[in-house]
Curated annotation (Swiss-Prot):
Keywords: ATP-binding, Cytoplasm, Helicase, Hydrolase, Nucleotide-binding, RNA-binding, Transcription, Transcription regulation
EC number: 3.6.4.13
Record's protein name: DExH-box ATP-dependent RNA helicase DExH11
Expression sites by tissue: Expressed in vascular tissues of leaves and roots of young plants.
Gene Ontology molecular function terms on file: ATP binding; ATP hydrolysis activity; RNA binding; RNA helicase activity
Function of the molecule: Component of the SKI complex which is thought to be involved in exosome-mediated RNA decay and associates with transcriptionally active genes in a manner dependent on PAF1 complex (PAF1C). Involved in the regulation of potassium deprivation stress response.
Organism, scientific name: Arabidopsis thaliana
Induction of its expression: Induced by low potassium, zeatin and cold stress. Down-regulated by high potassium treatment.
GO CC term (a single one): cytoplasm
Record has ATP-binding as a keyword: yes
Disruption phenotype: Dwarf phenotype.
Localization annotation: Cytoplasm
Length: 1347
């Protein structure tokens, strides 16, 4: 139904309501009036006034304006900041009434209608109505993000406008959505209170930068008086205390009456008074009431106090408990139901289906349909051809039944066109893509995801009508370039829209669904199946035979073994051939390999073939090499095709990972004919009918004639380099079954519904634009899923070509039965996203970052972190009581930590140097870092590192005395045989250990550590410890060295030996607080690195400061250091938790700050982050890099260019291929090209200046590609398409794609010119668009027009 207009020209869309019946338009009869003149609307007649004189006017001005009076009920401090409702022109205000509408829209309810389950007991049923707040309708314009705002102009209904604000995204908390940033001084009302107390009048309102210019009124005295006029303001006060909520059918009655505006607050108070929550907490009401009533007049009634307190109590209670209770209830937003139970009771649960299907539904389809009937969002994960589209069709049917809209989004234009053709016969369908808009008023719209994103950002009114959004191929979110679009759309969709997500099987389906549910605050039902409708068999094709390696998802190692045996047998036979034949065979294989490698990259000098070369390959090169390639490729493919044909496994799709290689393989089969005479006739008739819409010259394009020749023989080619109409012909003929062999790139597997009997992989490696790599399991599964036609084949066959060798079993197993690629966030900030979000009050850029899939896990843990933060804040604070007065332990601890950082920087380099290694021998005195945060430890090296233990064994002196049970010797054969080591003999009979002496034995060989490390003990009144240390734990190397007995220390664990060693260490101390002199890292250890030398001197100075601190050497140093560390750790933990919960912890926050600075520098936003005219222009740029396009327009770089030249330069914004032949440009075009490139370099340098990871040269080369400037220039001048193809080596399909996208860029530049007010640029872009829109480039899609 078209738009219905009321008499006052108020735009209205039928889909705004949504109900189960239908609407009709009936005449609205008005009352007859006696006088024809009185039949005119009241607002036409001018109001009558008394005759005015100069004296009366002067008197009125003085009384009305020069002696202002403040009314307490109107200008109170509590109300002043909310609304200044002063009627400056009351004398001319007349009660106006709009003219009555000519017609009215009324709902018609017809049986049978659906009853909701909860209404069945009552017997009576009434349709649901939507309550609309008229205050939002009247005052909420396009600046509001709420739905009850006035609709915009009809021309902006579908696409929206850059002047509109996006609708409020779903999932935002109420407190956040309604929060507004108020300027300082507004909320307090202090300045108004000063005014009421006799202060001077304020001329600068809060947040305003300029004051009011009073002009000639400045000399007048500013005297204020307060009075009350109950007769004139009493009624207004009563009227303002009410609020009216009306139903849908009231919208077209007397909506503009004055009493509507004066009754906007009553229902809120009434609703608040009826809440049982307010009555349950009288204490809360009393306290809140006191707070609310502060500053009010004493004559406030008890009823008003109760109402206001009740409302506040409800809000307070919900704010405190609502979010926490909801969080406790919703641990996970993704749920999985019992599909079997729903399947058994499906027809009981859904007795009246919105659409009937001619086949029995699968269980997952029934579960999804049941969820859709209940208005729930669903995520369906299933293999290719499993029947996911059934769920999308049911969503379309529900939207049609509910008189709402459904949107189907697809990742690529090809899928959109095909779905449009598939759904046209079933539903009211429209199509919206970048260059096509067909039936946009339809209830079911098919569009690309970018179009939907643009609608959301531009606040299109059609968003109100949408009930369902279907996301097809959701796994496309992993795409690096365009995956961010899916996340943006999901985040920006309003609350009333439900989701239908269709995806291939991925490991983290629940994780992704949980993110969507948590973001939108709605439950997502996850369903699907891992069962394939047609089971697959995976085989290897080697030496003319097929070897089965996988069946029913079970990998078969026997097939690999048989293929390997065949390879060994073939290689052994090859060894026995004559040397001459062997050399020839080797040369042939090497040539084949080199040609295969060459197929992945197209040479710059290759030009398009002429019309005369139709029968030959369209790619030039060495004829001898091409001939060798054809013979080799033809023999391989003929073997496989004949094998598949004998086994009735045709048609087959051969996936190659190069456009060039697809063409060469097809051309190699010049003598192969796979079609019958009837099929040839069908192909010929179809091609003639499809290509008849082209001009004569376009019908004879080399690509068109070459493809027709291949198609007649049952061979097809499908890749991005083909013309769009040629690709569609190939797809349609393949679906008809007349193409037997199709060579295609992987784009054919992305959503195109064209299953085959067999799928062949030419290789398991591909070039992804950066490197050659193995196929991912998800990519293999997506392409292999095209094998097997549901309802026609019992099994599908997947074949991997093996030419020279059989792949490894591990590689095959990983690709065939490995886990699919997880869904991962590709979210990234763009300038256009930032500019759009800065225009939205309800959603900040930080909120968008928080709601991205990349931040999902961090945001999910926020409640736990918040609880932990509250616990840590509630812990009692520890204090250090120093016996020497004011505690200096904090400074000492900070110096210790800083010295530790310096030491870590240089210790690794110093200790790993050969000079340090030569000093770290047994007996060397060292100082070790303490792991407990106390004073450093003096030690001695007992043993160096070995092959089995890379640590140094060091004895260190510790002040603490360990428990005696730790002093133990490891269980080992402790021999008392003197020949095995040192033994102990007493000096005298007193038996004291200090009088024992050592006696060397004759044992030789390395020392074996038999004591258990760490080994503790006490000697000479101090504790010691023996354990292993890494070289990073050495603080310094001392210049002292002690003789030690390794055997007695490490093997025997002799106490006398340890006592003697400890005593020698203690003797080395000149006093109790200092260590022996250390080796100088610079002089002794030959430290030469300048940075490390500087670090060393900083470290020594810090140690000197530490020694001068009064805590150094304190008896309580260890205890206080532990306390200082705990206090520091507590503060650090608090700061870390606060940081993790803040916006600064977001992954892309640094990039966001840098981009904000760039936008400020350019002038897109001001210092207050308000979007300026440059920013509004940048918001229009979707096809090109927004900064370059915006700066280019404001520098007026197209002023001196003709439309043909301007559109040629603009092709650099949309062209994507990197390596092309260099174009030949005119001097004018070359100058414009250089100027645009310099602009990009300048912008790249600016972004690098603000710490963005951008290289200026790469930035310019990535966003500006001038390979088609010459081609587009000639095309705009009217040159035939066949001739412009000769100017470049870019495939015809990419040329068409670039020109089509260029037309969209012209429209964007036209909109930008309108914003700028540049009429000359607007006309130039219009002329440029008309110059390129012609012939084959803009030929209509066969899916849209039919054949």
């Amino acid at each position: 139904m078209n738009k219905v207009e009321a008499g006052n020209e108020l735009g209205f869309r039928v889909g705004f309501s949504g109900h189960g019946g239908h609407l009709r338009v009936e005449p609205f009869y008005t009352a007859e009036r006696d006088d024809a003149l009185n039949s005119l609307p009241d607002f036409v007649s001018p109001p009558a006034f008394a005759k005015e004189t100069k004296e009366s006017i002067k008197k009125h001005i003085e009384e009305k304006y020069l002696i202002p009076r403040l009314e307490p009920d109107q200008f109170s401090a509590e109300k002043a900041e909310n609304q200044w409702d002063f009627d400056w022109f009351s004398r001319v205000k007349m009660p106006l009434q709009p003219s009555l509408p000519r017609s009215v829209v009324v709902p018609t309810w017809e049986l049978p209608f659906r009853r909701q389950k909860e209404d069945t007991e009552n017997g009576a049923w009434e349709p649901k109505s939507v309550e609309v707040d008229l205050s939002e309708q009247m005052y909420g314009d396009q600046d509001s993000g709420f739905f009850p705002r006035m609709v915009g102009p009809p021309k902006d209904f579908l696409r929206g406008s850059v002047n509109n604000r996006p609708f409020r995204p779903g999932g935002l908390e109420d407190s956040q959505s309604s929060e507004r940033v108020l300027p300082e001084g507004v909320s307090s009302g202090q300045w108004v209170q000063e005014l009421l107390n006799g202060g001077p009048a304020q001329t600068v309102p809060p947040s305003f930068k300029q004051s009011l210019d009073l002009g000639d009124l400045m000399p007048y005295p500013q005297t204020w008086s307060v009075y009350e006029d109950h007769s004139s303001h009493g009624n207004a006060s009563d009227e303002n205390s009410s609020k009216l909520s009306i139903q849908f059918d009231d919208l077209f009655k007397k909506a503009w009456e004055e009493d509507t505006f004066s009754e906007l607050e009553g229902d809120d108070h009434t609703a608040g008074s009826e809440s049982p929550k307010a009555e349950a907490e009288p204490d809360a009401k009393a306290s809140i009431s006191n707070e609310v009533s502060k500053g009010l007049e004493t004559d406030v009634t008890v009823l008003d106090e109760i109402l206001s307190s009740a409302k506040t109590a409800i809000m307070s209670e919900e704010a405190v408990t609502g979010s926490s209770d909801k969080q406790l209830r919703k641990e996970g937003w993704a749920t999985k139901g019992d599909s079997q139970d729903i399947a058994d009771r499906f027809y009981e649960l859904v007795p009246d289906m919105a659409i009937e299907f001619p086949f029995e539904l699968d269980n997952f389809q029934k579960e999804a349909i049941c969820c859709l009937e209940k208005g729930e969002s669903v995520f369906v994960a299933a293999h290719t051809s499993a029947g996911k589209t059934v769920v999308a069709e049911y969503a379309f049917a529900l939207a049609t039944k509910h008189c709402t809209r459904a949107v189907y989004t697809a990742p690529i234009k090809t899928i959109s066109n095909q779905k449009y053709r598939d759904f046209c016969g079933k539903f009211d369908v429209g199509l919206l893509t970048g260059d096509v808009s067909i039936r946009p008023e339809a209830s079911c719209l098919i569009m690309t995801t970018e179009i939907l994103r643009s609608m959301l950002y531009r606040g299109a009114d059609i968003i109100r009508d949408i009930e369902w959004v279907i996301f097809d191929e959701v796994h496309y979110v992993n795409d690096v370039e365009r995956g961010v679009v899916w996340e943006e759309v999901i985040i920006m969709l309003p609350r009333h829209i439900n989701f239908v997500l269709l995806s291939a099987t991925v490991p983290n389906t629940f994780e992704f669904a949980d993110w969507i549910g948590r973001t939108k605050q709605k439950e997502i039902r996850v369903t699907g199946t891992t069962k394939r409708p047609v089971p697959l068999e995976h085989c290897l094709f080697y030496s003319g035979e097929l070897y089965k390696v996988c069946e029913n998802e079970v990998f078969l190692s026997k097939g690999i073994k048989d293929a390997k045996d065949s390879q060994k047998k073939k290689n052994s036979n090859a060894v026995s051939v004559a040397p001459k034949q062997q050399m020839g065979s080797s040369a042939h294989q090497d040539g084949s390999k080199s040609q295969k490698h060459e197929a992945h990259s197209r040479g710059k000098q290759n030009k398009h073939s002429s019309v005369k070369d139709v029968g030959k390959s369209s790619y030039s090169g060495n004829s001898q090499n091409n001939g060798a390639f054809r013979r080799s490729a033809a023999s391989n493919w003929l073997l496989l095709i004949n094998k598949l044909s004998k086994m009735s496994l045709l048609p087959v799709v051969v996936f190659c990972f190069s456009k060039n290689y697809c063409d060469r393989c097809a051309d190699a089969l010049t003598g192969t004919d796979l079609t019958s005479s009837s099929e040839k006739s069908e192909i010929r008739v179809f091609c003639d009918k499809a290509f008849s819409r082209l001009k004569g010259s376009d019908r004879n394009l080399p690509q068109v004639l070459r493809l027709q020749s291949l198609l007649h023989r049952g061979i097809g080619v499908h890749h991005a380099g083909l013309l769009p109409i040629v690709k569609e012909v190939v797809e349609m003929l393949f679906c008809r079954g007349v193409i037997k062999v199709l060579f295609s790139t992987e784009t054919f597997a992305m959503g195109v519904n064209a299953p085959a009997r067999t799928v062949v992989f030419d290789a398991l490696r591909k070039f992804d634009g950066k490197e050659f790599r193995q196929l991912l399991p998800g990519e293999y599964t997506q392409m292999a899923g095209r094998a097997g036609r549901r309802g026609l084949d019992k099994t599908g066959t997947v074949v991997v070509m093996c030419r020279d060798e059989v792949p490894d079993e591990s590689d095959l197993r990983r690709v065939i039965v490995g886990s699919a690629t997880r869904l991962e966030s590709q979210f990234r900030l763009t300038y256009i996203m930032i500019l759009h979000l800065l225009r939205v009050e309800e959603l900040k850029v930080e909120d968008m970052l928080k709601r991205s899939f990349a931040e999902f896990h961090a945001q999910k843990k926020l409640p736990e972190k918040q609880q932990l933060l509250m616990i840590k804040r509630s812990l009692p604070t520890k204090h250090i009581e120093c016996i020497k007065g004011e505690p200096a332990i904090e400074d000492y601890y900070d110096m210790y930590m800083e010295a530790n950082e310096y030491n870590n920087k240089m210790s690794e380099a110093v200790m790993q140097s050969p000079y340090a290694q030569s000093f770290l021998v047994q007996g060397r005195v060292v100082v070790m870092k303490s792991g407990m945060g106390i004073d450093n430890l003096l030690g001695i090296v007992l043993k160096g590192p070995s092959n089995t233990n890379r640590q140094y064994v060091v004895l260190v002196i510790k002040s603490e005395i360990p428990p005696p049970e730790k002093n133990m010797v490891s269980i080992g054969k402790k021999s008392s045989d003197p020949s095995q080591g040192y033994f102990i003999a007493p000096k005298s009979k007193r038996g004291f250990e200090e009088e024992f002496y050592t006696k060397p034995s004759s044992r030789k060989g390395p020392v074996v550590i038999k004591i258990e490390l760490p080994y503790h003990g006490v000697a000479a009144g101090v504790g010691y410890e023996v354990k292993g240390f890494d070289n990073k734990e050495f603080l310094c190397i001392c210049d002292s060295k002690i003789k030690i007995d390794q055997v007695r220390l490490l093997e025997d664990g002799n106490k006398a030996a340890f006592s003697q060693t400890v005593q020698q260490l203690l003797d080395l101390k000149s006093d109790g607080n200092k260590f022996p002199p250390a080796l100088d890292p610079v002089k002794d250890l030959k430290l030469k690195d300048a940075e490390l030398v500087e670090t060393y001197y900083k470290w020594t100075n810090l140690l000197q400061k530490m020694s001068m601190n009064k805590c150094h050497g304190c008896v309580k140093l260890e205890e206080h250091m532990k306390l200082a560390r705990e206090i520091k750790k507590h503060k650090t933990d608090l700061k870390d938790l606060e940081f993790q919960m803040s916006d600064e912890a977001l992954l892309q926050m640094p990039a966001f700050q840098g981009r904000i600075d760039v936008l400020k520098n350019i002038g897109c936003i001001d210092d207050d982050l308000v979007v300026q005219i440059k920013g509004r222009v940048a918001c229009e740029m979707n096809s090109g890099e927004e900064l370059i396009c915006t700066v280019c327009l404001f520098e007026n770089q197209f002023e001196e260019l003709e439309p043909e030249e301007a559109v040629a330069i603009m092709s650099a914004f949309v062209f994507q291929q990197k390596n092309t032949s260099a174009p030949t440009l005119t001097p004018k075009l070359a100058k414009a090209k250089q100027r645009l490139y310099d602009t990009a370099i300048r912008l790249g340098e600016l972004q690098a200046q603000y710490n963005l990871q951008i290289d200026p040269e790469e930035y310019a080369q990535e966003n500006l590609k001038f390979g088609l400037v010459e081609v587009v220039y000639e095309w705009a001048k009217g040159t035939p398409f066949a001739e412009i193809c000769e100017l470049t080596d870019v495939p015809e399909g990419l040329i068409v794609r670039t020109i089509v996208r260029l037309d969209e860029t012209c429209r964007e530049f036209k909109n930008a010119a309108a914003i700028m007010g540049n009429s000359a640029l607007h006309k130039k872009m219009d002329a440029a668009s008309n110059a390129i829109k012609r012939d084959i480039v803009f030929a209509a899609s066969l899916y849209v027009t039919g054949v």
